[in-house]
């Protein structure tokens, strides 16, 4: 076992070996294989390439080097293309803070029987007058950044339960194509988390309709892990034991305290340690080629082309028409 695996229990170490192809004897070599690919994408600013960071992506892609690198590249590319989302990427940002306080997301105290963290969302809690859907997405991404620092969760992953009770048609009409695309790209395509299940409960017909629209844009693996339970909580309990669920999901525990996870982040004033802004990319363009040469590349060094960091042109964005019209 290397120091990079020090945070794993013996059971999780064995799981990483069997399910993720993680081998302590080749771990540093695996990490370096991914790091060496950085020079193939000079258009992307890789703000972190240290061992522990790259290891998250290897675990998320079962130690397939190219797939891990592609996820790493998409992670930073997503942030470059959506700079405004990450300008004030911290728990004390007003929009993120309010979303967190309303339980976007929540995190249950107990892990499931596979050692996965259970995230919960109560969709109707969204207060449209105080924060946006983008703020909710930012709060979720920030929370995942904090949680994924736990090596146990890098291996075991997460499950998500979304309760759609009392989520109105008016709220659903705000889910525009561009908003849904932003969420899919940020969570499915650009983050090193393993999601073992996404469970919808108490969803109305218009959420079924929305899911039908976005389903073709989901990866096959993602589609297989989405469960639409409706009002049948027994089917949820077959996959997540009621002993660890709050009463809102027919569980045996007290009602969930929406502010639990918010207090955790705010107590630590958690923020992402990377500033995603144009000013932070200060390497002169004429030095990029020199810095990208294999001889000058160091372990854990990242090289940035400042010309790659541009906001998406408004004309390139999808239209903001709602998928569900109130007319």
UniProtKB/Swiss-Prot annotation:
<dbReference type="GO" id="GO:0031901">
    <property type="term" value="C:early endosome membrane"/>
</dbReference>
<dbReference type="GO" id="GO:0005802">
    <property type="term" value="C:trans-Golgi network"/>
</dbReference>
<keyword id="KW-0333">Golgi apparatus</keyword>
<dbReference type="InterPro" id="IPR011074">
    <property type="entry name" value="CRAL/TRIO_N_dom"/>
</dbReference>
<keyword id="KW-0597">Phosphoprotein</keyword>
<feature type="region of interest" description="Disordered">
    <location>
        <begin position="288"/>
        <end position="327"/>
    </location>
</feature>
<dbReference type="Pfam" id="PF03765">
    <property type="entry name" value="CRAL_TRIO_N"/>
</dbReference>
<keyword id="KW-0446">Lipid-binding</keyword>
<keyword id="KW-0472">Membrane</keyword>
<dbReference type="GO" id="GO:0030136">
    <property type="term" value="C:clathrin-coated vesicle"/>
</dbReference>
<protein>
    <recommendedName>
        <fullName>Clavesin-2</fullName>
    </recommendedName>
</protein>
<dbReference type="Pfam" id="PF00650">
    <property type="entry name" value="CRAL_TRIO"/>
</dbReference>
<dbReference type="InterPro" id="IPR036865">
    <property type="entry name" value="CRAL-TRIO_dom_sf"/>
</dbReference>
<feature type="domain" description="CRAL-TRIO">
    <location>
        <begin position="96"/>
        <end position="257"/>
    </location>
</feature>
<keyword id="KW-0967">Endosome</keyword>
<comment type="subunit">
    <text>Forms a complex with clathrin heavy chain and gamma-adaptin.</text>
</comment>
<keyword id="KW-0968">Cytoplasmic vesicle</keyword>
<dbReference type="InterPro" id="IPR036273">
    <property type="entry name" value="CRAL/TRIO_N_dom_sf"/>
</dbReference>
<dbReference type="GO" id="GO:0007040">
    <property type="term" value="P:lysosome organization"/>
</dbReference>
<feature type="modified residue" description="Phosphoserine">
    <location>
        <position position="325"/>
    </location>
</feature>
<comment type="function">
    <text>Required for normal morphology of late endosomes and/or lysosomes in neurons. Binds phosphatidylinositol 3,5-bisphosphate (PtdIns(3,5)P2).</text>
</comment>
<dbReference type="InterPro" id="IPR001251">
    <property type="entry name" value="CRAL-TRIO_dom"/>
</dbReference>
<dbReference type="GO" id="GO:0080025">
    <property type="term" value="F:phosphatidylinositol-3,5-bisphosphate binding"/>
</dbReference>
<dbReference type="GO" id="GO:1902936">
    <property type="term" value="F:phosphatidylinositol bisphosphate binding"/>
</dbReference>
<dbReference type="GO" id="GO:0005768">
    <property type="term" value="C:endosome"/>
</dbReference>
């Amino acid at each position: 076992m290397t120091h990079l695996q020090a945070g794993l229990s013996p059971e999780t170490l064995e799981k990483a070996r069997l399910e993720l192809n993680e081998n302590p004897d080749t771990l540093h070599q695996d990490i370096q294989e991914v790091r060496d690919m950085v020079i193939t994408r000079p258009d992307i600013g890789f703000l972190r390439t240290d061992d522990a960071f790259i290891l998250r992506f290897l675990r998320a892609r079962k130690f397939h080097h190219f797939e891990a690198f592609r996820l790493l590249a998409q992670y930073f590319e997503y942030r470059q293309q959506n700079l405004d989302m990450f300008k004030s990427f911290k728990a004390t940002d007003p929009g993120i803070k309010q979303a967190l306080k309303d339980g976007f997301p929540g995190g249950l105290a107990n892990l499931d029987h596979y050692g996965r963290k259970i995230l919960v969302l109560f969709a109707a809690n969204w207060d449209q007058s105080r924060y946006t859907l983008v703020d909710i997405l930012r709060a979720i991404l920030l929370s995942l950044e904090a949680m994924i620092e736990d090596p146990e969760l890098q291996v075991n992953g997460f499950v998500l339960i979304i309760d759609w009770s009392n989520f109105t048609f008016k709220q659903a009409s705000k889910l525009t194509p561009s908003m849904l695309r932003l969420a899919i790209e940020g969570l499915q395509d650009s983050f090193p988390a393993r999601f073992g299940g996404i469970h919808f409960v108490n969803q109305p017909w218009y959420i079924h309709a929305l899911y039908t629209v976005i389903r073709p844009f989901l990866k096959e693996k993602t589609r297989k892990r989405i469960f639409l339970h409706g009002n049948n909580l027994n089917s949820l309990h077959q996959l997540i034991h009621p002993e660890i669920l709050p009463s809102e999901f027919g569980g045996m525990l007290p009602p969930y305290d929406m502010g639990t996870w918010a207090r955790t982040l705010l107590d630590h004033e958690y923020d992402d340690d990377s500033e995603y802004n144009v000013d932070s990319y200060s390497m002169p363009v004429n030095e990029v080629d020199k810095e990208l040469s294999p001889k000058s590349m160091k372990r854990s060094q990242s090289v940035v082309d400042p010309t790659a960091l541009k906001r998406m042109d408004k004309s390139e964005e999808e239209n903001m028409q709602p998928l569900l019209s109130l007319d």
